[in-house]
Amino acid sequence: TLFASQFSLIDKLTNTYYETHGTKRDKEAIYTQVRNEIEKLQTNKRYIQQLEDIVNKHKGNVMQLLRESMPEFSEMDHRLLCFIYAGFSAKAISVFTGDSVGNIYMRKSRLKAKIAQSNSENREDILRYIP
C-alpha cells in the first residue's frame, strides 16, 4: 500500500542515517540511498507498476482508464501522467525522467489538451486528477 511503501522508504533512510550519523560518509550514504530510490522510478518496471497500482487504487482506476482510452499515448506519456496523478512535483518528475521542468509542464499541457479533445467517454474522469 501507499502507506506501507512511504514508511518503508522513511525507515530505510532513517536506518542509513542512524548507521552513518556523525561519520564522514553520512551525507554520502543518505545521498546514495535517495539516488537508489530515484533510480527505481526511472528504470524498475515492477516498482513503476506498483506506483500505477497505488494510483489506480486511490484515484478511481484512472491509469487503467487512461491506458484503455488513450492507447496511442507512449509509455513515457503514461508514466508522466502516473507521476502527476501520484502527486509528484514537476521538479521531482524532472529528476525521474531526465527532462527539464519546462518540458514537463509543456508535455503535461499537451497531454491534457489531447485528452480533452478526445472522443473518450472517460475523458472527464481522466482529467479530474490532473491539476
Task: Indicate where each model-derived feature is located.
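Cytosolic signal-transmission helices at domain junctions
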Residues: 1-5
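Histidine phosphotransfer helical core of two-component systems
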Residues: 11-50
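Cytosolic nucleotide-binding catalytic cores of signal-transduction proteins
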Residues: 36-131
